[in-house]
């Protein structure tokens, strides 16, 4: 999954996305024992408006997956009391928004479909559905594809049209070049199982590769797109919302994921995730830590110090935010391309190149990047870098993030982009036509003009973030209701400041 380039360019300076651009943050509930209300996409997240570091007094619940209320119009004030009639109507609405076929029905239909002769295997492009003979009359006027082969069934991402709504799915799929590289790299690194979170095309590539002689890897796809339910059996796909750790098919699906992660005491498995870039980093980090905790449950005591290997695929300018929550992660120079997005394809120079990178806790010296695509090994950094990424003797690192050769600024004491110059007014490097310090510049948290939000001393550090996760882990052991536990995690504000617990006790009076 990915997001449109026009959004990415505007986000590069901030290092966060989606609601944050409009001054909205994920918040902790005033009452930690209250479960989050449900929308069609599972438990909602709690948000609060922030203006120059000051939180509005009234928080609200909104959908975790959809950033546009046209796609999911759920809205509820945190302190709002709903009547039984409204709660009942909401439950009915949530049920109506679910897919027309259950997971069990999809599996039953799939098993029947593959038994049909080739001439009777049809796919409705209009409804995005595999058709059985009994369905033909109902879909007679629709656009159909006939003679669906076994090979086509193995590549559903090529049968299904991408969900390209920018603010909801932003479903851009790995290009074959990147997909084959990732699958080959995972095999070279010796992994036998891959948990693909929001990476359907990699899931397909691994399954196709496993059917040959090259690799015996297995894959489990977790994805919010219900259309994949009709192409996979129980052990290959779970419908899942990565922003709130919600399994749409309940405990049975959760157990599938748990068994997959804990097989062989958790050895030989890696998680590869490709979240929508418009999503907030904090909820994703909380979800991934829950998957890590699930994996750790299956480990022996001798392996308790080990980390679940992860490939998190995201734009390079989210580096500081990701490393805040996962300090052991590093960013690789490899540029990940997307098939159905012209600006995410491999280019020959600088800004034509994809901004998408791999963040991982796998040691970078173990990861070989293809020399034929312009990568070389830096003996000083002990990792592969892009050809233009030159080693800086002052920084003692290959510093480029975007594929261009960066220049060292002695005043800033770091390397900067070649298009930037040092501004004496701002005392930092920036684009030549930037606006100097003013009301629109500075920190979104504390209002100071000498730094951005991502570098604010008041924002939670990785230590604080991990401590907060531990706090919610403690609550998880105390509480038994899984949906309630998910609400606790999903309503977490990781960037708490020194006033954190006092903010929780503030009374809510008005909303501006």
UniProtKB/Swiss-Prot annotation:
EC number: 2.1.1.-
Annotated compartments: Cytoplasm; Nucleus, Nucleolus
Main enzyme class: transferase
Residues where Zn(2+) 2 binds: 124, 127, 139, 142
Keywords linked to the UniProt accession: Cytoplasm, Metal-binding, Methyltransferase, Nucleus, S-adenosyl-L-methionine, Transferase, Zinc, Zinc-finger
Domain (DHHC) ranges: 393-445
The protein's name: rRNA N(6)-adenosine-methyltransferase ZCCHC4
Organism encoding this protein: Mus musculus (Mouse)
Gene label: Zcchc4
């Amino acid at each position: 999954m990915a997001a449109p380039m026009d959004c990415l360019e505007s986000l590069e300076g901030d290092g966060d996305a989606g609601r944050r651009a409009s001054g909205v943050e994920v918040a902790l509930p005033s009452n930690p024992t209250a479960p989050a209300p449900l929308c069609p996409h599972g438990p909602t997240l709690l948000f609060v408006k922030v203006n120059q570091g000051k939180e509005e007094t009234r928080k609200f619940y909104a959908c975790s997956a959809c950033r546009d209320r046209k796609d999911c119009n759920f809205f509820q004030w945190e302190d709002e009391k709903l009547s039984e009639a409204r709660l009942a109507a909401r439950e009915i609405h949530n049920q109506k928004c679910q897919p027309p076929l259950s997971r069990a029905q999809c599996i039953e239909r799939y098993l029947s479909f593959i038994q049909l002769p080739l001439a009777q295997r049809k796919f409705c492009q209009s409804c995005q559905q595999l058709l059985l003979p009994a369905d033909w009359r109902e879909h007679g006027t629709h656009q159909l594809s006939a003679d669906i082969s076994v090979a086509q069934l193995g590549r559903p991402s090529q049968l299904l049209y991408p969900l390209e709504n920018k603010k909801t799915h932003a479903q851009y799929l790995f290009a074959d070049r990147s997909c084959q590289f990732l699958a080959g790299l995972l095999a070279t690194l010796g992994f036998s199982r891959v948990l693909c979170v929001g990476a359907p095309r990699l899931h397909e590539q691994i399954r196709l590769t496993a059917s040959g002689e090259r690799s015996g890897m297995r894959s489990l796809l977790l994805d919010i797109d219900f259309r994949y339910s009709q192409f996979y059996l129980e052990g290959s796909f779970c419908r899942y919302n990565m922003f709130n750790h919600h399994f749409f098919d309940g405990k049975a699906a959760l157990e599938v994921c748990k068994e997959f992660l804990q097989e062989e005491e958790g050895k030989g498995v890696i998680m590869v995730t490709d979240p929508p870039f418009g999503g907030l980093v904090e909820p994703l980090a909380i979800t991934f830590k829950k998957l890590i905790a699930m994996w750790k449950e299956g480990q022996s005591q001798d392996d308790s110090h080990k980390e679940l290997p992860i490939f998190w695929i995201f734009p390079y300018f989210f580096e500081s935010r990701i490393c805040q929550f996962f300090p052991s992660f590093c960013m690789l120079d490899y540029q990940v391309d997307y098939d159905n997005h012209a600006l995410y394809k491999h280019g020959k120079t600088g800004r034509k190149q994809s901004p998408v990178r791999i963040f991982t806790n796998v040691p970078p010296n173990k990861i070989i990047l293809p020399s034929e695509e312009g990568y070389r090994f830096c003996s000083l950094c002990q990792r592969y870098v892009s050809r233009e990424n030159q080693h800086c003797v002052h920084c003692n690192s290959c510093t480029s993030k975007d594929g261009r050769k960066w220049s060292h600024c002695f005043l800033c004491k770091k390397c900067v982009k070649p298009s930037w110059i040092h501004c004496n007014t701002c005392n930092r490097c920036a684009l030549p036509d930037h606006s100097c310090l003013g009301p629109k510049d500075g920190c979104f948290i504390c209002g100071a003009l000498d730094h951005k939000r991502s570098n604010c001393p008041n924002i939670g550090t990785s230590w604080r973030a991990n401590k907060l996760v531990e706090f919610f882990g403690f609550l998880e052991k105390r509480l038994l209701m899984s949906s309630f536990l998910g609400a606790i995690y999903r309503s977490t504000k990781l960037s708490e400041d020194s006033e954190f617990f006092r903010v929780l006790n503030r009374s809510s009076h008005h909303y501006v």
